[in-house]
């Protein structure tokens, strides 16, 4: 489980935007609000160390987030940041409503059926537009579990377990 100060990978700087030093970031989760709420972000350096940067402004532009970092005023000052991964501290994330979870909290959870059958662990999450899909692997098999209320019947982050009630045939694919 993540600690409150652990860094969480949120996206990647894929380009600059304009001439005033804005960075174009693709969020990995398809969710913009977390990045938009950050006051400080961390970018991976060439040696994989994380450098912290204060956020001046953040806005959504098409399917990306445009970040303006304090102290950078033109494109030439930020070109070296393109290609870096963007991280934030877990304790900076805005609170969620009951029953909502951040992807970083779900990755690694053990998944069992309501009958007690162990399916494996959540290894990745796919954003489909209508609902997320959890990719659960046990080493031999892979299950694609849609994130729907009637299928995901329980999540216990403290115990590290997600309980699912799969529809008929879901686990046969």
Curated annotation (Swiss-Prot):
PRC barrel domain mapped to chain residues:
98-170
Q: Name one GO biological process term.
A: rRNA processing
Pfam families documented for this protein: PRC_RimM, RimM
What molecular function terms (GO) are annotated for this protein?
A: ribosome binding
Q: PANTHER family under this entry?
A: RIBOSOME MATURATION FACTOR RIMM
Q: Which source organism does the UniProt entry give?
A: Geobacter metallireducens (strain ATCC 53774 / DSM 7210 / GS-15)
Keyword Transferase annotated: no
Keyword set, alphabetical order: Chaperone, Cytoplasm, Ribosome biogenesis, rRNA processing
Similarity field: Belongs to the RimM family.
User: Which gene name belongs to this protein?
Assistant: rimM
Q: Which domain of life is it from?
A: Bacteria
The stretch of residues making up the signal peptide is none
Predominantly, its location class is cytoplasm
Q: Does the keyword Chaperone apply?
A: yes
Protein's UniProt name: Ribosome maturation factor RimM
SUPFAM superfamilies (alphabetical): PRC-barrel domain, Translation proteins
- How is the subunit organization of this protein annotated in UniProt? Binds ribosomal protein uS19.
Q: Where in the cell is it found?
A: Cytoplasm
Print the domain comment field: The PRC barrel domain binds ribosomal protein uS19.
Any one GO CC term of the record: cytoplasm
> What biological function has been recorded for the protein in this entry?
An accessory protein needed during the final step in the assembly of 30S ribosomal subunit, possibly for assembly of the head region. Essential for efficient processing of 16S rRNA. May be needed both before and after RbfA during the maturation of 16S rRNA. It has affinity for free ribosomal 30S subunits but not for 70S ribosomes.
């Amino acid at each position: 489980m993540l600690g409150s100060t652990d860094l969480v990978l949120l996206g990647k700087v894929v380009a600059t935007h304009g001439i005033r030093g804005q960075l174009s970031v693709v969020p990995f989760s398809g969710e913009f609000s977390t990045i938009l709420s950050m006051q400080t972000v961390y970018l991976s350096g060439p040696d994989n160390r994380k450098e912290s940067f204060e956020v001046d402004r953040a806005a959504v532009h098409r399917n990306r987030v445009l970040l303006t970092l304090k102290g950078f005023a033109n494109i030439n000052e930020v070109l070296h940041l393109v290609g870096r991964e963007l991280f934030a501290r877990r304790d900076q994330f805005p609170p969620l409503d009951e029953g909502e979870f951040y992807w970083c909290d779900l990755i690694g959870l053990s998944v069992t059926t309501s009958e007690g059958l162990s399916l494996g662990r959540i290894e990745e999450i796919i954003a489909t537009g209508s609902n997320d899909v959890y990719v659960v692997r046990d080493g031999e098999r892979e299950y694609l579990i849609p994130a729907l209320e009637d299928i995901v019947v329980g999540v216990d982050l403290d115990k590290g377990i997600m309980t699912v009630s799969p529809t008929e045939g879901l686990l046969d694919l």
